[in-house]
Amino acid sequence: MGGNPPIKNHTIVNKIVSSRKIERIVIFTVYRDNWEPYMKKYTEVFQSHFPNLNTACLLLDTEQIDFNSYLDADLIIIGGGNTEKYIATYVNQEFKNYIVHMLNKGAKVIGFSAGALLLGEKVYVSPNDNSDHQIKIKNGLGVFSQFLISVHYDSWNDKANKDRAEELVDVTIISLNDHSCLVLDKLGNIIEKID
């Protein structure tokens, strides 16, 4: 997803809910003030489809997680927020192994903003998204590798920054507006872009 929750595009919601029954959602986030009420925004669109939804919210920056306790997730959501904090928290081999394992089991994985960015092999961090106000290219989880993504493209007016970043990485950076998304297969190939 290119922006923040909730998902407002019904096409995206319908693709997710029609693909499999969702009984358990696991949300990975990082600590920030008032984080708990915000988590409902990630799941509210699914509540009407699946009223008995079981949801777990995990903060890897403040707690140790046994990933084996979350192997029953049908939908994994990686939240948004401070991109560099998300990268420092989630870009590691253990989390990558968990995500790849869950994709191979058929779970759906959704990243919002920072959570979408870190799914790539490389991560484009816009100058609008860090305190140094510089273009940064960081390592990601490697779920996809043929391209990078730019989030909040429209609201950040990020075209010039994205174009400069493409010259640095010599690979396409796909722009995602706040209510856009890319649908990928489990190998990271693009199935569809929904605007």
What are these regions (language model features)?
Residues 57, 77-78, 110-112, 174-176:
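General beta-strand structural signal in soluble alpha/beta enzymes
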